[in-house]
UniProtKB/Swiss-Prot annotation:
Gene: JAL41
UniProt modified residues of type N-acetylalanine: A2
PROSITE patterns recorded: JACALIN_LECTIN
Protein name: Jacalin-related lectin 41
GO molecular function: carbohydrate binding
Alphabetized SMART domains for the sequence: Jacalin
Species of provenance: Arabidopsis thaliana
Annotated family: Belongs to the jacalin lectin family.
Database matches in SUPFAM superfamilies: Mannose-binding lectins
DNA repair in keyword set: no
Domain Jacalin-type lectin stretches: 2-143, 146-289, 297-441
KW Endoplasmic reticulum (keyword) present: no
C-alpha cells in the first residue's frame, strides 16, 4: 500500500490528485513564469505502458522544461526539493532526484525551502494544489526492496550470515583485525528508528569503529581484499575500507591478494551478508536508494526591538557572505549571501536601508568555514521609536569577525552547541531592529 505524504508548499489553489495506481514516474514537465511555477505535469508507468497525466496549473508564457526517468533501466524518482513564496503561496522552483541523477533546479531558487522524500522509498504518484500557478505538491511513496550483491572472498567455508535486506540504514560498524586477517564484525542497523545489532566471527585482535551520522550520512562503498591465509588454510578477508557519503574513510588491514569493490552508484549500503568461521571469509552488500535527510532546522528567537516589518530568509546549506550597513546610531541594513543544497548561490534581500557608506563585507572561507554564533548589542537610540541593533559580531569555526557597529546597550548571543548558523530572520525599517538565526546540527 502506498504512503501518502501531505502536500508541501504554500496555501492556495484547488486540490488535485493523480492517484497512486502506477509503478513509477517516467517524465516530468514543468513551466516557470514570472510569478513562479505555472504548471506541472507527470507521465506515469502502469503495467509497462506510459500514462499521460493531466496538466496542473495554467500554460502561460514561458519555457517548458522536462526531466525524463528511464524506468526501463530501473531508474526511479526518490525525492523532490523546491522553494515557495510565503506571501503568494506559489512554488518558485523545483528539483527532482532519482536513484541515478538529479535534475536542474527548475524556476528561481528563492523563498522558503520544502522537500519530499522518504529513505528506502520511491515516488509513484502525486497530488497537490494549483490554479493559475502551482501552490503545493504532495506524493505517494512505496518501499524499494534492497538489491543483493554477490559475495567477495571464500564461497564455501564457514557458515552463512545475512543481515540488512530489510533495514533502513547502518549506524555503526565495528571490525576486529588481528594484524593479518579480518576476524570479527558487528553492525548496528536502523529499522524505523530502532537500532538492531548483529555480530559474527572471533573477536580476537584490535577493534576499529566507524560511526555513521544516519540519517544524514550513509556508507557508499566497501573496498577490500582476500587471500588464502595460514593457519586457517582457506580464503579470508585481509583488508576492508569503508567510505561514507560525507567523504569519511575507515581503513582496516593491509591489501593482500585479490582486491574487490562493493558499490552501487546512487545507492547506499544498508546491510551485509557473507560467510564466517574463525575469520570473516567473505562479504557482500545490500544496496538501496538513499537521500540523506537534511538536518533538522531550528529557529532561534530574534533579539532586539519590536519595530519595523518582519523578514525571514529561511535556512540554507551555508552562509557565504555577510553584508553590514552602518549608520550614525546603529546597524541600518544587512544582507546575506547563501549556498543552497543544489550548490547555487542565493543572494538574500536587503533588510533595512543603506546609507552612502554602503556595506562592509564579512566573507567566509566556504565550504571550510561556517558561522557558529552571532553576538550583538541593541539599544534605544535617538530617532528610533523602538530598539535597534547597534553592533554585530560573527564567530566561525576558525575565527571571530571584527565588531560591526558600537558596543552599546544590551548584549546578546545567538548560538546552539554543536550547531551552525545557516540563515537569518528579524525586523527592519530604515534600520535593523531585531535579528535571529536558523541553526542546524554540524554534520561534517
Amino acid at each position: 500500500m502506498a504512503l501518502m505524504v501531505n502536500a508541501k508548499g504554500g496555501n492556495g489553489g484547488k486540490e488535485w490528485d493523480d492517484g497512486f495506481d502506477y509503478e513509477g514516474v517516467t517524465k516530468i514537465h514543468v513551466r516557470a513564469g514570472s510569478e513562479g511555477i505555472q504548471f506541472i505535469k507527470f507521465d506515469y508507468v502502469k503495467v509497462g505502458k506510459t500514462i499521460d497525466g493531466p496538466i496542473h496549473g495554467v500554460s502561460g508564457l514561458g519555457m517548458t522544461q522536462t526531466f525524463e526517468i528511464n524506468h526501463l533501466q530501473k531508474e526511479y524518482l526518490v525525492s523532490i526539493e523546491g522553494y515557495y513564496d510565503k506571501s503568494t503561496g506559489v512554488i518558485q522552483s523545483i528539483q527532482f532526484k532519482t536513484n541515478v541523477k538529479t535534475s536542474d533546479m527548475m524556476g528561481f531558487n528563492k523563498g522558503t525551502k520544502f522537500s519530499l522524500g522518504i529513505i528506502r522509498n520511491k515516488i509513484i504518484g502525486f497530488h497537490g494544489f494549483s490554479d493559475k500557478n502551482v501552490y503545493s505538491l504532495g506524493a505517494y511513496f512505496i518501499k524499494v526492496l534492497a538489491t543483493k550483491s554477490g559475495m567477495q572472498g571464500g564461497q564455501n567455508t564457514g557458515k552463512s550470515y545475512d543481515y540488512g535486506g530489510d533495514y533502513d540504514g547502518i549506524r555503526k560498524v565495528y571490525v576486529t583485525y588481528d594484524g593479518t586477517s579480518i576476524r570479527h564484525m558487528r553492525v548496528d542497523y536502523d529499522k524505523a528508528g530502532q537500532v538492531e545489532c548483529y555480530e559474527y566471527g572471533d573477536k580476537t585482535g584490535t577493534q576499529y569503529k566507524i560511526t555513521v551520522n544516519y540519517p544524514y550520512e550513509c556508507i557508499t562503498s566497501v573496498e577490500g581484499s582476500y587471500a588464502n591465509t595460514q593457519p586457517y588454510g582457506c580464503i579470508v578477508l585481509r583488508s576492508l575500507t569503508f567510505k561514507t557519503s560525507n567523504g569519511r574513510t575507515l581503513v582496516i588491514g593491509t591489501v593482500t591478494g585479490t582486491k574487490f569493490l562493493l558499490e552501487s552508484k546512487g545507492n547506499a549500503i544498508v546491510g551485509f551478508h557473507g560467510r564466517v568461521g574463525s575469520c570473516v571469509d567473505s562479504i557482500g552488500a545490500y544496496y538501496a536508494p538513499f537521500s540523506p535527510s537534511p538536518p533538522p532546522t531550528q529557529k532561534l528567537e530574534g533579539q532586539g526591538g519590536d519595530g519595523g516589518d518582519s523578514w525571514d530568509d529561511g535556512a540554507f546549506l551555508n552562509v557565504k557572505k555577510v553584508y553590514i550597513g552602518q549608520g550614525s546610531n546603529g546597524i541600518v541594513a544587512v544582507k546575506f549571501e547563501y549556498e543552497n543544497d543544489a550548490s547555487e548561490v542565493v543572494v538574500g534581500d536587503e533588510h533595512g536601508k543603506t546609507t552612502l557608506l554602503g556595506y562592509e563585507v564579512f566573507e567566509l572561507d566556504y565550504p571550510n568555514e561556517y558561522i557558529t554564533s552571532l553576538e550583538g548589542c541593541h539599544d534605544k537610540v535617538m530617532g528610533a521609536e523602538t530598539g535597534v541593533i547597534t553592533m554585530l559580531r560573527f564567530k566561525t569555526n576558525k575565527r571571530t569577525s571584527p565588531p560591526f557597529g558600537l558596543e552599546a546597550g544590551v548584549n546578546f548571543v545567538l548560538q546552539k552547541e554543536s550547531h551552525k548558523i545557516t540563515g537569518f530572520h528579524g525586523k527592519s525599517s530604515t534600520m535593523l531592529h531585531q535579528i535571529g538565526v536558523h541553526v542546524v546540527p554540524i554534520t561534517e
